[in-house]
Amino acid sequence: MSEHSTTTASPTRTEAELRTLMARAVREVRETNPLAPSITNTVTQNFVANAQLAVGGSAAMVYLPDEGECVAALGGAVYINLGTLLPVYEQTVPATARACAGAGKPWVLDPVGIGIGSLRTQLIEAVRENPPAILRGNASEIIAVAELWGLGDDAAEDASGDGPRGVDSTDSVDAAERAAVACARFTGGAVAVSGTTDLVTDGA
């Protein structure tokens, strides 16, 4: 287990308890209007900003290294999506992850298209030192991240497909379960695997 891991056994929540917690989170967002900056792909920038505004948050879309460092300090959390990359992201993404860690701010990683080109691989390797509080992706993406971060051979053994195919998964959510748990234990946060039936784990 990595030095980053802080996972402890968490209590099992009932569906009713989860609904109550989610409702409370929604109320808190509306009451506090938190800033949640994003370094996101150009395809979804408008959608992400509108979604954040719709739930009561405040949005900011950035892409330069000094912008990432600034909003990491100002915002409540940062969302990073690797769907469409610019050359400057080679500096922006690691710098923002470091700034979040230094400021004690959580950040979310969406490793869209992992395996397409060398830059995505370099970025995901780089942020291993300052891992996200939440990792979300499809099954193939989560398996690929676990393998890239060296979190054991179990993830590769469970893989049922050929890895990510662009933004699509070739693996089932069930096949990504051990990879998701390994990633969550490493980061000390949560991992969400999207699919026909989503999987969310804190590694417990």
Model-derived segments and spans:
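Glycine/small-residue-rich loop that forms an oxyanion/phosphate-binding "nest" at active or ligand-binding sites
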Residues: 81, 89-138
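Small-residue (G/A/S/T)-rich helix-start motifs and N-terminal tracts that mark the onset
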Residues: 2-95, 99-101, 178-204
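Conserved phosphate/ATP/ADP-binding segment of small-molecule kinases
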Residues: 118-203
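Short, basic, glycine/proline-bearing loop/turn elements
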Residues: 34, 51-54, 78-83, 106-112, ...
